[in-house]
Swiss-Prot record:
Organism whose genome encodes this protein: Leptospira borgpetersenii serovar Hardjo-bovis (strain L550)
Molecular function in Gene Ontology: GTP binding; GTPase activity; translation elongation factor activity
Superkingdom field: Bacteria
Protein name: Elongation factor G
Keyword Ion transport among UniProt keywords: no
Binding-site positions, GTP: 24-31, 91-95, 145-148
Lineage: Bacteria, Pseudomonadati, Spirochaetota, Spirochaetia, Leptospirales
Keywords (A to Z) from UniProt: Cytoplasm, Elongation factor, GTP-binding, Nucleotide-binding, Protein biosynthesis
One annotated Gene Ontology cellular component of this protein: cytoplasm
Length: 706
């Protein structure tokens, strides 16, 4: 099959390429689905379950840690071929702590499959993933999985897709049977029934629609035609004449899908080998090729003017490094080629630092195995060796000076002090931290200048736990960890004036600078951490020292006076000042700015803010009381509770400070039957008693400074 693809001329090859992601809530079965796709496309020759008895683990979960936990942590890239098309698949993590992996893979994809559980339906992480897909305008089809499970109801899930995710969700199939009776699907375009029989569901039987499903199939077929005809005049006319063809229907659905105005819904059970091949057909029929997607870049020579890239191999090269891994053979850089051609031996330039690199080896990846290739063209996803770069860097062949727009990276909400148990491991610890921070922009590290301790920051407890475990396993570093720390912030609540004169005379040239003005709170909805406004007139502060004042202000933002955390939401306006011809300098105005800021900050009724997390708990209804109680004890504000089929879903907002250790509490109070997910929602003021406690603790720890 691969030779057939190689013979196409590039434009044809591009039309027959699909770059897709498979995204979902944790435990919706997406790694199992990927495993089946690889099996049916002959990329693997045996099926292994995620938590299988054979101990092999799914193909895409290549890290030992993933096989043990049964969750996917890193996006593994792989490719396969189906009906003369090349499909590049990025398998993305479903746990909310790893959303940067999802963000990063969606950035380089052309379309995606949103996997939903036929029982649980749209869950919190489905909403997060969907929001990420919207941010990057990713067209998608939905696959309602696990229809073999007790309580499965695909039509309820479609309603949730419409209500919760606001999708124009239209089924292109209906199931033949449900739960233990799931046998296959009815295709609402061809109006035929398909049964998946034989070992591993390889034997697909096409038959007439069963009598008991004809009425429902006809009704859903009409609904599908109505929805599809909105995107095709040709189909509308054909419907009036009573002559619509399968081709017309598919073309109309494809147009609506790529325009993000319709979401075709497929059904089945990956675990029971039902419906996967028809979903693959849907990927070819309805999802975008690289030609269908507009990719933009910023022109560095023209004020970062937005330009549109062309999926054309004859144009100058533009590609994006979207993932880094330390493999057995050195750093592996996953790259998406957006324009032009990338070949072995070529010189490429990193736009973030203008460094040039020679391309030594190009590979196509299959989870953690690789296949050498000589070149890659627009639309390809491949891996490079030995290129030193960071995730999100743009490479060109030097003919263009452009960069892809930077990816949205959320700020970390939790930190932890770490130290190596044995000093002989310090070198390995430094190596591990250097690698992980390069691979994952939401995993950050720094050394506290006062305590000398190494601090790691991330998106949640599990996120940091996984990195601690990886340091032990991959680098042999045993760590001593401190208690988790919440990323508090400080801000002001009222307007306050400042007027500070810095004067210092120590023989020779002195220092002089006066800074006056006011600071005021920036409303939270403006999502601006700091704003500097210059209203000085008449040269009270010379122009060259205005930046010095700004620098002085900025140096105060790193550490507030209440509990030593960063300051956000402050607008500083300078409107007066004074200078001295001889004694004024950049440093004098920086120092004046620093003291003026502190003066204003302490008068502006400062307060402490804490991260509030959106928490969603799913569990059996019999434990609803225990779940509500556990959230109330944690200063939780219940937003919504819904009950369906003996299951309850509770949505709440809870301060991160009170969520540590929650998974253990939830497990023990619900016999391990409930699960929760959380993500950052916003910053909010801490209650007075908590603020007093934090300030008292800060004073005790910093009494030496007073």
């Amino acid at each position: 099959m691969s030779t057939a693809v190689a013979e196409f001329k590039p434009s044809e090859k591009l039309l027959k390429t699909r770059n897709i992601g498979i995204s979902a809530h944790i435990d919706s079965g997406k790694t199992t689905l990927t495993e089946r796709i690889l099996f049916y496309t002959n990329r693997i020759h045996a099926i292994h379950e995620v938590r299988g008895k054979d101990g092999v683990g799914a193909k895409m979960d290549s890290m030992d840690l993933e096989r043990e936990r049964g969750i996917t942590i890193q996006s593994a890239a792989t490719y396969c071929q189906w009906k003369n098309h090349t499909i590049n698949i990025i398998d993305t993590p479903g746990h909310v702590d790893f959303t940067v992996e999802v963000e990063r893979s969606l950035r380089v994809l052309d379309s995606a499959i949103l996997v939903l559980c036929g029982v649980a339906g749209v869950q919190s992480q489905s909403i997060t993933v969907d929001r990420q897909m919207r941010r990057y305008n990713v067209p998608r089809v939905a696959f309602i999985n696990k229809l073999d499970r007790t309580g499965a109801n695909p039509f309820r899930v479609i309603e949730q897709l419409k209500e919760k995710l606001k999708h124009n969700a239209v089924p292109v199939q209906i199931p033949i049977g449900l739960e233990n009776d799931l046998k296959g699907v009815v295709d609402l375009v061809t109006m035929k029934a398909y049964y998946f029989e034989g070992k591993d569901g390889m034997d697909i039987q096409e038959k007439e629609i069963p009598d008991d499903l004809k009425e429902l199939a006809n009704k859903k077929h009409e609904e599908l035609l109505d929805a599809a005809s909105m995107f095709s005049d040709e189909l509308t006319e054909a419907l009036l004449e009573g002559t619509p063809t399968e081709e017309m229907i598919k073309k109309a659905i494809r147009t609506g899908t790529i325009e993000l105005k319709i979401t075709p819904v497929f059904m089945g059970s990956a675990f029971k080998n039902k419906g996967v091949q028809k979903l693959l057909d849907g990927v070819l029929d309805y999802l975008a090729s690289p030609v269908d997607v507009k990719n933009k870049a910023l022109d560095q020579n023209n004020n970062e003017e937005m330009i549109v890239l062309e999926s054309n191999y004859e144009k100058p090269l533009v590609c994006l490094a979207f993932k880094l891994e330390d493999g057995r053979y050195g750093q592996l850089t996953y790259v998406r080629v957006y324009q032009g051609k990338l070949s072995k031996g070529m010189t490429i330039y990193n736009m973030s630092n203008n460094k040039k690199h020679n391309v030594g080896r190009l590979c196509r990846m299959h989870s953690d195995e690789m296949e050498d290739i000589d070149s890659a063209e627009a639309g390809d996803i491949i891996a490079l060796f030995g290129i030193d770069c960071a995730s999100g860097d743009t490479f060109t062949d030097g003919k263009l000076k452009v960069s892809m727009e930077s990816m949205f990276v959320p700020a970390p909400v939790i930190s932890l002090t770490i130290e190596a148990k044995e000093s002989k491991h310090l070198n390995n610890l430094a190596k591990a931290l250097n690698r992980f921070t390069k691979e994952d922009p939401t995993f950050q590290t720094h050394v506290d200048p006062e305590s000398g301790q190494t601090i790691i920051k991330g998106m949640g407890e599990l996120h940091l736990e996984v990195y601690i475990e990886r340091m032990k396993r991959e680098y042999g570093v045993e760590l001593i960890t401190g208690a988790p720390q919440v990323a508090y912030r400080e801000t002001i609540t009222s307007k306050a004036d400042f007027d500070y004169t810095h004067k210092k005379q120590t023989g020779g040239q002195g220092q002089f600078g006066r800074v006056a003005g006011y600071m005021e709170p920036i409303p939270l909805e403006e999502t601006l951490d700091y704003d500097f406004v210059n209203k000085v007139v008449g040269g009270a502060i010379p122009r060259e020292y205005i930046q010095s004042v700004d620098k002085g202000f900025k140096s105060c933002l790193e550490r507030g006076s209440l509990i030593g955390f960063p300051i956000i939401g402050v607008r500083c306006v300078i409107n007066d000042g004074a200078y001295h011809d001889v004694d004024s300098s950049d440093m004098a105005f920086q120092i004046a700015g620093r003291y003026a800021f502190r003066q204003g900050f302490n008068k502006a009724n400062p307060q402490i803010l804490e991260p509030i997390m959106k928490v969603e708990v799913d569990g059996p209804s019999e434990f609803q009381g225990a779940i509500l109680g556990s959230l109330n004890q944690r200063r939780g504000m219940i937003l919504n509770t819904t009950e369906e089929d003996a299951y309850c879903k509770t949505e709440a907002e809870v301060p991160l400070a009170d969520m540590f250790g929650y998974s253990t509490v939830l497990r023990s109070s619900t016999q391990g039957k409930a699960e929760f997910s959380m993500e950052f929602s916003r910053y909010a003021p801490v209650p007075r008693n908590v603020a007093e406690e934090l300030m008292k603790k800060y004073k005790v720890n910093n009494k030496d400074e007073d």
